[in-house]
């Protein structure tokens, strides 16, 4: 009997020693693996210099939020300026190095060489369709031409504000404007827009829906027209479809990185009286028309005062911002 008890005690002692040895071996192996992995991670981190990304956080706010004026002294060292001008300007200047000359003059005002971009456009229509407002600050020179006051005024309303637009199919649907910020924008080489307001029975009010000659004309042979009709009333529309397009748009707010300089004209065109234009700092100004060199010299001289009433934006804006923006 004593032999059996000694054997049992000896078995448990051997088992305990064996288990202890196995556990110590496992711990040593785990320590070795952990130390190795830690060492590899540290070495790779030093060598890779990678960005550390955290968890995915929800994005709040809108890119179209109207930012406070961010222009500060010496801010131009890391800002870009786009200057837009009609094609008649370089034709009159007739100097192949005129842009280099202006770049050197802008340098004296704190704008480094390479930060100012010169962009030419042929006419109001071309610019309104595809403005390419890509810079931190965008200054547009518009030559005042008698007879085109309305096109210029509406171009100013278009590019000084953000618009959200959708195409309109006027052959299939009636349309109504839902508020003061809701407008119809037509563009083309010659836009004539006619409307017929409808009652609740879809019968014309003062017009016949089957006879476009009875429709009211709201735009006649214009390149750019921003149409405003009575809100909450359906309208049947008719346009010169071969030379014109029309879109249903909502004005979202001011596009604060754009300023317009009217060149010539007895009075400056004013769009701030529009009830859809929120109170804002005037970003449309006028300079006297003499010669294009004189105009550009004036712009260079006052460029820093001009951008002080603007706000730098962090993204590019082009025609998509008021056509199919989402």
Swiss-Prot record:
Post-translational modification (record): N-glycosylated. The N-terminus is blocked possibly by pyroglutamic acid.
Main location: virion
Glycan attachment residues as annotated in the record: 69, 238
Name of this chain's protein: Outer capsid glycoprotein VP7
Note: Some rotavirus strains are neuraminidase-sensitive and require sialic acid to attach to the cell surface. Some rotavirus strains are integrin-dependent. Some rotavirus strains depend on ganglioside for their entry into the host cell. Hsp70 also seems to be involved in the entry of some strains. In group A rotaviruses, VP7 defines the G serotype.
InterPro entries, per database record: VP7, VP7_1, VP7_2
Disulfide bonds listed in the record: 82-135, 165-249, 191-244, 196-207
Example GO molecular function: metal ion binding
HAMAP family on file: Rota_VP7, Rota_VP7_A
Species for this entry: Rotavirus A (strain RVA/Human/United Kingdom/ST3/1975/G4P2A[6])
Protein task: Calcium-binding protein that interacts with rotavirus cell receptors once the initial attachment by VP4 has been achieved. Rotavirus attachment and entry into the host cell probably involves multiple sequential contacts between the outer capsid proteins VP4 and VP7, and the cell receptors. Following entry into the host cell, low intracellular or intravesicular Ca(2+) concentration probably causes the calcium-stabilized VP7 trimers to dissociate from the virion. This step is probably necessary for the membrane-disrupting entry step and the release of VP4, which is locked onto the virion by VP7.
Lineage top rank: taxon: Viruses
Region spans: GPR motif: 253-255
Region (CNP motif), start-end ranges: 165-167
Intracellular or extracellular location(s): Virion; Host endoplasmic reticulum lumen
The keyword Signal belongs to this UniProt entry's keyword annotation: yes
GO CC annotations on file: host cell endoplasmic reticulum lumen; T=13 icosahedral viral capsid; viral outer capsid
Binding site for Ca(2+) 2: 177, 228-229, 231, 301
Keywords: Calcium, Capsid protein, Disulfide bond, Glycoprotein, Host endoplasmic reticulum, Host-virus interaction, Metal-binding, Outer capsid protein, Signal, T=13 icosahedral capsid protein, Virion
């Amino acid at each position: 009997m004593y032999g059996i008890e000694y054997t049992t005690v000896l078995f448990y002692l051997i088992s305990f020693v064996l288990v202890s040895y196995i556990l110590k071996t496992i711990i040593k192996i785990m320590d070795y693996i952990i130390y190795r992995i830690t060492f590899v991670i540290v070495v790779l981190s030093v060598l890779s210099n990678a960005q550390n990304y955290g968890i995915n956080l929800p994005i709040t706010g809108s890119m179209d939020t109207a930012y406070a004026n961010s222009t500060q002294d010496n801010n131009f060292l890391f800002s870009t300026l786009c200057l837009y001008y009609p094609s008649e300007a370089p034709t009159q200047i007739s100097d192949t190095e005129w842009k280099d000359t202006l770049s050197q003059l802008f340098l004296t005002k704190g704008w480094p060489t390479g930060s100012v971009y010169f962009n030419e456009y042929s006419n109001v229509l071309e610019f309104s369709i595809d403005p390419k407002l890509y810079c931190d600050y965008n200054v547009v020179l518009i030559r005042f031409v008698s007879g085109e006051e309305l096109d210029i005024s509406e171009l100013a309303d278009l590019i000084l504000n953000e618009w959200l637009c959708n195409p309109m199919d006027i052959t299939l649907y009636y349309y109504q404007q839902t508020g003061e910020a809701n407008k119809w924008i037509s563009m083309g080489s010659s836009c004539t827009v006619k409307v017929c307001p409808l009652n609740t029975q879809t019968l014309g009010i003062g017009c016949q829906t089957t006879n476009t000659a009875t429709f009211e004309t709201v735009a006649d042979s214009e390149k750019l027209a921003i149409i405003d009709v009575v809100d909450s009333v359906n309208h049947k529309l008719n346009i010169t479809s071969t030379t014109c397009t029309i879109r249903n748009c909502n004005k979202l707010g001011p596009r604060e990185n754009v300023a317009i300089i009217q060149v010539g004209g007895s009075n400056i065109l004013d769009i701030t009286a529009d009830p859809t234009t929120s109170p804002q700092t005037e970003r449309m100004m006028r300079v006297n028309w003499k010669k294009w060199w004189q105009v550009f010299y004036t712009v260079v001289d006052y460029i820093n005062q001009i951008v002080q009433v603007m706000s730098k934006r962090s993204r590019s804006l082009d025609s998509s911002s008021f056509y199919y923006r989402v």
